[in-house]
Amino acid sequence: MKRKVKKMAAMATSIIMAIMIILHSIPVLAGRIIYDNETGTHGGYDYELWKDYGNTIMELNDGGTFSCQWSNIGNALFRKGRKFNSDKTYQELGDIVVEYGCDYNPNGNSYLCVYGWTRNPLVEYYIVESWGSWRPPGATPKGTITQWMAGTYEIYETTRVNQPSIDGTATFQQYWSVRTSKRTSGTISVTEHFKQWERMGMRMGKMYEVALTVEGYQSSGYANVYKNEIRIGANPTPAPSQSPIRRDAFSIIEAEEYNSTNSSTLQVIGTPNNGRGIGYIENGNTVTYSNIDFGSGATGFSATVATEVNTSIQIRSDSPTGTLLGTLYVSSTGSWNTYQTVSTNISKITGVHDIVLVFSGPVNVDNFIFSRSSPVPAPGDNTRDAYSIIQAEDYDSSYGPNLQIFSLPGGGSAIGYIENGYSTTYKNIDFGDGATSVTARVATQNATTIQVRLGSPSGTLLGTIYVGSTGSFDTYRDVSATISNTAGVKDIVLVFSGPVNVDWFVFSKSGT
């Protein structure tokens, strides 16, 4: 009996030791576990679990890492990142970089992404790295971007009407970068996505949040974010160049290439077609451009601008209180992303000078250029001879966010960067007793048309100039067309169906 008891005792001891070994091999869950909607800070990161309904579990681990599981949900988001006070733009924060790794196992509709919001404007944004059964957002892409070592993303913009937001129920824009192929680990330059969006006209506001996020929609799944490092402020936007190099007044000067400013709010922003400009301008702000070479003289000024309010820009020489050369009056263009070129006459200026733009209120500026001839007819001499060459850049108004005045190699200027639907208006053209044809000097790579209309872009159609390819945008040819007999003083509008550069045009009394 004693022998049997000893055997049982030895067996029990072995079992206990085995259990201890097994327990010792199981990792202890050190993270905090939450099940329902909650926000807070953990491990130096801001976190949030949000759902409308369903079963959710989120375990908060060291630093930015976490794991999550979901089922029977409507919509659920699990995220860890950094929140801000909506008082700085991404440029003011500096470079934002996310380095991540995730064991991602969705069953149905889900995203693995960098996610966040901005205010003013209110924007919800996604940089989607991987997804489940459906690739978001189900819209037509605006373009693509490629990041070195990160791959290619398609860009989308969608609108949410009366939907939940960080400011309650609201209507707001959603911006999307969606990879063309899935991945679950890597490094994301968030700032580069923001820059590319703005260059496509997708304006960012003041930063509220950036977070690595797992989102599920009417699905189930689990994910283990084993790496999530968010670095902010490594490389703020550099100050503009202080280069003393002379700049040609008659070539386009990019607004963001200024030498100094008195503004604490001004920022370099993105503009359509991958451009840049300046914005967040306030009354009294000044921007200085050094060493502008006017040669024998300039008497005109044009700027490509966007604004939702009427405002004005003074053009001064050498200092913010220097000689007032002229004032550019800017009417609302309809939105901060709708750019138009506006022109004004200035007092003749020669030689090399610093130019200071003095602002009376908010406006976005893409670029500006000076001209040797006055772009606006002088008071008391407000008609133009239809039978003398009319420079294309001497328009009174234009429609088209990307239209630009540029210098020609042999001297003079022209208009270009024209797209379908753009138009330019030339006021007070004196046709006398009647013109029946028009000739334009143009350059284009592809066949296109220019409609000649009376009064407005939808006014009476006088005729259409059919333009064949000239071989390149630098090869100019004269092209003519017959128009309906036009007499007296009229406003003429050129309406474009596609890309073309226009140097000048002129009317004649006989058909061509």
From Swiss-Prot:
<feature type="binding site">
    <location>
        <position position="254"/>
    </location>
    <ligand>
        <name>Ca(2+) 1</name>
    </ligand>
</feature>
<keyword id="KW-0858">Xylan degradation</keyword>
<dbReference type="GO" id="GO:0031176">
    <property type="term" value="F:endo-1,4-beta-xylanase activity"/>
</dbReference>
<keyword id="KW-0326">Glycosidase</keyword>
<dbReference type="Pfam" id="PF00457">
    <property type="entry name" value="Glyco_hydro_11"/>
</dbReference>
<dbReference type="InterPro" id="IPR018208">
    <property type="entry name" value="GH11_AS_1"/>
</dbReference>
<feature type="binding site">
    <location>
        <position position="501"/>
    </location>
    <ligand>
        <name>D-xylotriose 2</name>
    </ligand>
</feature>
<dbReference type="InterPro" id="IPR001137">
    <property type="entry name" value="Glyco_hydro_11"/>
</dbReference>
<feature type="binding site">
    <location>
        <position position="256"/>
    </location>
    <ligand>
        <name>Ca(2+) 1</name>
    </ligand>
</feature>
<keyword id="KW-0119">Carbohydrate metabolism</keyword>
<feature type="binding site">
    <location>
        <position position="280"/>
    </location>
    <ligand>
        <name>D-xylobiose</name>
    </ligand>
</feature>
<feature type="domain" description="CBM6 2">
    <location>
        <begin position="388"/>
        <end position="508"/>
    </location>
</feature>
<feature type="binding site">
    <location>
        <position position="413"/>
    </location>
    <ligand>
        <name>Ca(2+) 2</name>
    </ligand>
</feature>
<feature type="binding site">
    <location>
        <position position="364"/>
    </location>
    <ligand>
        <name>D-xylobiose</name>
    </ligand>
</feature>
<feature type="domain" description="GH11">
    <location>
        <begin position="33"/>
        <end position="228"/>
    </location>
</feature>
<dbReference type="InterPro" id="IPR005084">
    <property type="entry name" value="CBM6"/>
</dbReference>
<keyword id="KW-0136">Cellulose degradation</keyword>
<dbReference type="InterPro" id="IPR006584">
    <property type="entry name" value="Cellulose-bd_IV"/>
</dbReference>
<feature type="binding site">
    <location>
        <position position="337"/>
    </location>
    <ligand>
        <name>D-xylobiose</name>
    </ligand>
</feature>
<feature type="binding site">
    <location>
        <position position="393"/>
    </location>
    <ligand>
        <name>Ca(2+) 2</name>
    </ligand>
</feature>
<dbReference type="InterPro" id="IPR013319">
    <property type="entry name" value="GH11/12"/>
</dbReference>
<keyword id="KW-0624">Polysaccharide degradation</keyword>
<feature type="binding site">
    <location>
        <position position="391"/>
    </location>
    <ligand>
        <name>Ca(2+) 2</name>
    </ligand>
</feature>
<dbReference type="GO" id="GO:0046872">
    <property type="term" value="F:metal ion binding"/>
</dbReference>
<feature type="binding site">
    <location>
        <position position="364"/>
    </location>
    <ligand>
        <name>D-xylotriose 1</name>
    </ligand>
</feature>
<dbReference type="InterPro" id="IPR008979">
    <property type="entry name" value="Galactose-bd-like_sf"/>
</dbReference>
<feature type="binding site">
    <location>
        <position position="474"/>
    </location>
    <ligand>
        <name>D-xylotriose 2</name>
    </ligand>
</feature>
<feature type="region of interest" description="2 X 61 AA approximate repeats">
    <location>
        <begin position="279"/>
        <end position="477"/>
    </location>
</feature>
<protein>
    <recommendedName>
        <fullName>Endo-1,4-beta-xylanase A</fullName>
        <ecNumber>3.2.1.8</ecNumber>
    </recommendedName>
</protein>
<feature type="binding site">
    <location>
        <position position="276"/>
    </location>
    <ligand>
        <name>Ca(2+) 1</name>
    </ligand>
</feature>
<feature type="binding site">
    <location>
        <position position="271"/>
    </location>
    <ligand>
        <name>D-xylotriose 1</name>
    </ligand>
</feature>
<comment type="similarity">
    <text>Belongs to the glycosyl hydrolase 11 (cellulase G) family.</text>
</comment>
<feature type="binding site">
    <location>
        <position position="366"/>
    </location>
    <ligand>
        <name>Ca(2+) 1</name>
    </ligand>
</feature>
<keyword id="KW-0479">Metal-binding</keyword>
<feature type="binding site">
    <location>
        <position position="337"/>
    </location>
    <ligand>
        <name>D-xylotriose 1</name>
    </ligand>
</feature>
<feature type="binding site">
    <location>
        <position position="280"/>
    </location>
    <ligand>
        <name>D-xylotriose 1</name>
    </ligand>
</feature>
<keyword id="KW-0106">Calcium</keyword>
<dbReference type="GO" id="GO:0030246">
    <property type="term" value="F:carbohydrate binding"/>
</dbReference>
<dbReference type="GO" id="GO:0030245">
    <property type="term" value="P:cellulose catabolic process"/>
</dbReference>
<dbReference type="InterPro" id="IPR033123">
    <property type="entry name" value="GH11_dom"/>
</dbReference>
<keyword id="KW-0732">Signal</keyword>
<dbReference type="InterPro" id="IPR033119">
    <property type="entry name" value="GH11_AS_2"/>
</dbReference>
